[in-house]
Amino acid sequence: MAQQYQPGQRWISDSEAELGLGTVLAQDGRLLTVLYPATGETRQYALRNAPLTRVRFSPGDSITHFEGWKMTVQQVDDVDGLMVYHGLNAQNEAVTLPETQLSNFIQFRLASDRLFAGQIDPLAWFSLRYHTLEHTSRQLQSALWGLGGVRAQPIAHQLHIAREVADRIAPRVLLADEVGLGKTIEAGLVIHRQLLSGRANRVLILVPENLQHQWLVEMRRRFNLQVALFDEERFIESDATNPFEDTQLALVALEWLVDDEKAQDALFAAGWDLMVVDEAHHLVWHEDKVSPEYSLVEQLAEVIPGVLLLTATPEQLGQDSHFARLRLLDPNRFHDLAAFRAESENYRPVAEAVQELLDKGRLSPAAHKTIHGFLGNEGEALLTAVNDGDTEASARLVRELLDRHGTGRVLFRNTRAAVQGFPERKLHPYPLPCPDEYLELPLGEHAELYPEVSFQAQPDASEEERWWKFDPRVEWLIDQLKMLKRTKVLVICAHAETAMDLEDALRVRSGIPATVFHEGMNILERDRAAAYFADEEFGAQVLICSEIGSEGRNFQFAHHLVLFDLPSHPDLLEQRIGRLDRIGQKHIIELHVPYLETSPQERLFQWYHEALNAFLNTCPTGNALQHQFGPRLLPLLEEADDGEWQALIDEARTERERLEAELHTGRDRLLELNSGGAGEGEALVEAILEQDDQFALPIYMETLFDAFGIDSEDHSENALILKPSEKMLDASFPLGDDEGVTITYDRNQALSREDMQFITWEHPMVQGGMDLVLSGSMGNTAVALIKNKALKPGTVLLELLYVSEVVAPRSLQLGRYLPPAALRCLLDANGNDLSSRVAFETLNDQLESVPRASANKFIQAQRDQLTPRINAGEDKVTPRHAERVAEARRRLAADTDEELARLTALQAVNPTVRDSELDALRKQREQGLAMLDKAALRLEAIRVLVAG
């Protein structure tokens, strides 16, 4: 053994290939010292079993001098144990290169190089690489890519909007669903799908300051998007020249940005592909004056290609405000308010005619005349068929009208009336006597709405004299929880102090298991509290939340909600109820409202219930009514005679009923049909649920965990604990936490246990693990023994995996047309390709591992025979590669031509189709076809099989 090592020889580490070429420094007794100049690392190995492979190049190989020039080897000499290579450089001149002068940065990543360098991987890794290629290809071609990985129940209208918008180049749309229909999820799906497809790389999210945390939680928990929250402190403390350039997704409060010109300059300079603006209806615009917030968003919309505006419904906004949002998206199309009003008025009769067709299945003469006037003579045949009772013609007519809808491509608005699946609400009021201690409190802002806060804030308040010892709502709550026994109950109150005090009260006075959730806790602490509440067996019966602390959380596995106090605005009340009242809630929402009699609490309850009807139904008019009656409401809460109070209630109720009638009359059923997807969303839901039921992902991930040295153990039903083992292969594996994580593949489990990672094909752990496999050399060589009686012992089969590789920007999405699926070739001794007759899994079941040392000896002995067979493999698969590229070109051309034809025809009748959109699509087609023409065949992996 000792004689095989000579100072100056080049060896490569079998376990640390990333170190580059090593140089033998010394052999001292039983130790061997090797320097790796590329990294400056030195390693000492036991002489008997050093994990090293001798680097030997052969004639035909291309090698690199440490100064950077290359040569093609023609002859190799062994001079005193050192290799000397002779050959030709790039200028075709004869050169000599001793191995001591080889580049230190050579790494054997090509399959053939690694095979002959003795870097042979475990058999399981080869299978892992093959399956990674197959799964990657399938996902890139899937219509669900970017839609199925969200931690939420798949809902038809959300999926339809997400696919429709995210598949556009630089989408510019208004998302105006009614409250509770999931605009934030729709926006997150669009962001996620655009990022995965490469259509967007940098995203800016502008939100009101009070919604920053909610967005942060939603994007991280639901979509695994690592959003950077920017505020003044972070901006000032950053060492970067432009702090915004360091992040892919920035979450910024609009209030701060408007007041900080330096931050504005940095934001404009950073460059963005997509901008999302929440609560866009708060951007004030009038023909003669605009707010600073509106002006800033308008300037950003001029330079950022994609824009998503999340806003209240057009009916709530009013026509002028609605126009203001649309002109942010397309100022050329929406430039004249008067013209927009006229166009909207002209379109209203058409929407009413469609309503008639949908409700009655036929058209009256007046409706027929209206639609004929809108479509012209080209619609006559369709109208005749509709009148003859042709249901297919009715559907076609609706589609024709949808295409011509003035804002149908830029505005998406779903309503609760059109979307089914919401639960019923049941109200349980509990009037309780107001204690004397509260009657003596000084008046202050909302003091009598939240008397416990005022009581505890008194200078002379003592620890012994806690408010929860005399407040009847606490005794009532304890009794209510005992009656409900193990039923999960969510309690929401306005202030964090109240929430923490209530937890103390329940612990001291009842022993009922409770946990608290407030804005003073970090995300990890909130996750633990939410998980404790969600645990059916050992968890808390009650979760007590503050107003702010519960933002962005979903507790719909519970259906009992206690409103310990009432918020000062109807929108906040709707947000509270919305924690449970969501699509997919399977139970009636039981609303428990305790309040103190003859106090402002009682009057606020009456205001919400009798005037706004805000407990039993959503209240789209709440904001308008609060704005209209707020100045009169607040003084009357504290002191007014009953007659004056009742007059206000009656007046507000009448105004609400009038506004609701207006909203109903103004409903645009055609727009609702377009926003709902007319059945397309339902098909996506079905496909996602079917994908959820498959076992391919858990099976694949187990092999991935085994390969990378990740230990997995059962946590509970449908859940696993992952931890790095001592043999962890790569510390960069995206486990998410060095200490370990808990995961589930079950969507329902993930919805109730936010402390668990929801693993789907889109999860960063899955995508990152697959990238580690394919971006490196892992599993691209293997040697195995094949047990098959039909093969003569000693027969050598060669299995080669190729991929059709196209180097192109991700935004072109060429992976959809030419995915990296393996082109497999199985060569026998006579050069015949057996791959079509012997499937991969069939072959895999017949294989046994070979010790690495034995495998290496065999490969070195067979090198001269294997090299020409490897070269012959490319000739075998080249025709299949050419067919695959031709099919990719055909599909790309067909898809883009079809979309161009559709949009061109649409543009003729609907000016919201922008010229820039058509130009971008034509450019994408041209670039895509040009890139596909350059697609090359690459050898991905080699497996040598020896019959035994």
Curated annotation (Swiss-Prot):
UniProt keyword Mitochondrion, yes or no: no
Gene Ontology BP term (one): regulation of DNA-templated transcription
Domain Helicase C-terminal: 473-627
EC number: 3.6.4.-
PROSITE patterns assigned: HELICASE_ATP_BIND_1, HELICASE_CTER
Motif DEAH box in this chain: 278-281
GO molecular function: ATP binding; DNA binding; helicase activity; hydrolase activity, acting on acid anhydrides
Keywords: Activator, ATP-binding, DNA-binding, Helicase, Hydrolase, Nucleotide-binding, Transcription, Transcription regulation
The Helicase ATP-binding domain, residue ranges: 164-332
One Pfam family recorded for the sequence: Tudor_RapA
Residues bound to ATP: D177, E178, V179, G180, L181, G182, K183, T184
CDD domains linked to this entry: DEXDc_RapA, SF2_C_SNF
Record InterPro entries: Helicase_ATP-bd, Helicase_C-like, Helicase_RapA, P-loop_NTPase, RapA_C, SNF2-like_sf, SNF2/RAD54-like_C, SNF2_N
SMART domains for this protein: DEXDc (SM00487), HELICc (SM00490)
Family indicated by similarity: Belongs to the SNF2/RAD54 helicase family. RapA subfamily.
Reported function: Transcription regulator that activates transcription by stimulating RNA polymerase (RNAP) recycling in case of stress conditions such as supercoiled DNA or high salt concentrations. Probably acts by releasing the RNAP, when it is trapped or immobilized on tightly supercoiled DNA. Does not activate transcription on linear DNA. Probably not involved in DNA repair.
Subunit structure: Interacts with the RNAP. Has a higher affinity for the core RNAP than for the holoenzyme. Its ATPase activity is stimulated by binding to RNAP.
PANTHER family to which the protein is assigned, alphabetical: DNA ANNEALING HELICASE AND ENDONUCLEASE ZRANB3 FAMILY MEMBER, SWI_SNF-RELATED MATRIX-ASSOCIATED ACTIN-DEPENDENT REGULATOR OF CHROMATIN SUBFAMILY A-LIKE PROTEIN 1
HAMAP family with a match to the protein in the record: Helicase_RapA (MF_01821)
Entries under NCBIfam families matching the protein: PRK04914.1
Name under which the protein is recorded: RNA polymerase-associated protein RapA
Protein species of origin: Pseudomonas fluorescens (strain Pf0-1)
Gene for this chain: rapA
